[in-house]
């Protein structure tokens, strides 16, 4: 997986911009494919542009998944953690973007929000009610 990602990056000859998606085989992971995206890095206050780039991450992944014939996608909390997007605003963008995409593409892809931290579980649990 790491070698395939390195080949993709070498072929591009530049870093992947925020908001786009790529797909690779999953190799030894318990799935068939991995969708890769780069979220916005937050330094200071979250702006409209940050929110738009984060939404683009989710839309790009969903479009690529649909084009690749996938029926389900599990999303982690994109751009939180190391990239410092605050958890609740990131979850709001994720849920809104996925719901909008699913309304326009009914029945195409099941989405799972896979969270690692209790705080994210609480946020998503509250927002998805």
Task: Name every feature range the model reports, one short phrase each.
Residues 42-129:
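Phosphate/ribose-phosphate-bearing ligand recognition and processing surfaces
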Residues 1-67:
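Glycine-/small-residue-enriched capping loops at alpha/beta junctions
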């Amino acid at each position: 997986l790491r070698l395939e990602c390195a080949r993709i990056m070498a072929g591009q000859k530049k870093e992947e911009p925020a908001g786009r998606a790529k797909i690779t085989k999953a190799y030894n992971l318990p799935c068939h494919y991995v969708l890769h995206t780069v979220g916005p890095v937050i330094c200071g206050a979250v702006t409209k542009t940050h929110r738009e780039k984060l939404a683009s991450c989710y839309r790009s992944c969903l479009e690529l998944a649909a084009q690749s014939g996938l029926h389900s996608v599990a999303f982690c909390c994109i751009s939180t953690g190391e990239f410092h997007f605050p958890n609740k605003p990131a979850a709001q963008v994720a849920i809104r973007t996925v719901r909008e995409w699913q309304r326009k593409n009914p029945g195409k892809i099941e989405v799972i929000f896979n969270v690692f931290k209790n705080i994210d579980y609480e946020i998503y649990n509250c927002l998805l009610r």
